[in-house]
Design a protein with these regions (language model features):
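Conserved alpha-helical substructure of the radical SAM core
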Residues: 39-71, 83
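Short acidic donor-binding/metal-coordinating loop in glycosyltransferase active sites
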Residues: 75-76
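Flexible, active-site-adjacent loop/turn segments at secondary-structure boundaries
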Residues: 7, 12-13, 39-40, 139-142, ...
Length: 189
């Protein structure tokens, strides 16, 4: 049984997907967003090591509250722990639970066959991806996160090709992302 590194769990999320959500914050993120509200999730291999059953114990004990919601994974970057995520979502999917990944898309590796096979397996048990596009401009994105947005935008296109439901999320920060030309460019993307 795989164990994941979990930062924390929120039992009543209302902004992390449809309905009331059980929100699991994964530990580890390669991005260094200047406005990150969870910088304590950045370091991998910290947090609490938990099995899928341990993570979901609180969800199943409160299941009546989630009938129009489900489970959302966020972070950190949940796709850093792909094997654990696949095991988690496979169990939830088998039980008919709505699954959602809140991701930056930074882990997308289209040239890595192993990653792509795991991603396709994960997408079979994923109902929704909330994709956080931090900045549409490549240079501004790098200044904001310390990473290019190339893989992130490629991930968005891949999800579109696979017909995976996606909600694009974008944090509007005056002086950083709140510029008409960038918002229009993001809208056209």
């Amino acid at each position: 049984m795989t164990k994941g590194y979990i930062h924390s769990i929120e039992s009543c999320g209302t902004v992390d997907g449809p309905g009331i959500r059980y929100v699991i914050f994964f530990q580890g993120c390669p991005m260094r967003c200047l406005y990150c509200h969870n910088p304590d999730t950045w370091e991998p291999n910290k947090g609490t090591q938990m099995t899928v059953d341990e993570v979901l114990e609180g969800f199943y004990s409160n299941m009546p509250f989630y009938h129009n919601g489900g489970v959302t994974v966020t972070g950190g970057e949940p796709m850093m722990q792909m094997d654990f995520l696949i095991e988690l979502f496979t169990k939830l999917h088998k039980d008919g639970i709505h699954t959602c990944i809140d991701s930056s898309g930074i882990m997308f590796q289209p040239d890595n066959e192993t990653f792509m096979n795991k991603l396709d397996t994960l997408l079979e048990v994923t109902d929704l991806i909330m994709l956080d596009i931090k900045h549409i401009n490549p240079q501004k994105h790098k200044e904001l996160t310390a990473h290019s947005n190339e893989r992130i935008l490629a991930f968005a296109k891949y999800l579109d090709e696979k017909h995976i439901p996606v909600w694009i999320r974008h944090v509007v920060v005056p002086g950083i992302t709140l510029y008409k030309e960038y918002l229009e460019e993001l809208g056209h993307f």
